[in-house]
From Swiss-Prot:
Protein name: Protein yippee-like
GO cellular component, one term: ubiquitin ligase complex
Yippee domain mapped to chain residues: 12-109
Family designation: Belongs to the yippee family.
UniProt keyword Metal-binding, yes or no: yes
Molecular function GO terms recorded: metal ion binding
Annotated signal peptide: none
Keywords: Metal-binding, Zinc
Annotated organism of origin: Solanum tuberosum
Ligand binding (Zn(2+)): C16, C19, C72, C75
Amino acid sequence: MGRLFVLTLEGKIYSCKHCGTHLALSENIVSKSFHCKHGKAYLFSKVVNVTSGEIENRMMMTGMHTVADIFCVCCGSIVGWKYETAHEKSQKYKEGKSVLERFKITGPDGSHYWASHDTHVAGSDADDV
């Protein structure tokens, strides 16, 4: 393994809730209308300091997508997923973008999001942008 380089962001930052590693800037949020099994999730145009898992096809609320889970590069915690391919034409805007689960990250103001006990969403994503 090589040397680990971790980028430090400036501005309104979303970080890994386990180790504090910077993951994304609020200015890169595309949508706050996404959902995961733990509650809310945000779609970002750019995330940093993550590694990708294996690419797989998943049936989500908006159809079939090819995705890869993403993990914090420092502590290895799963923090969301990245869209590789959207199989529906209307969902192509998601390609190359990443979703961070609010339950797994700390907000710019230091806020934590707790898992919603009412939420049960199979195949996590949303239609509205």
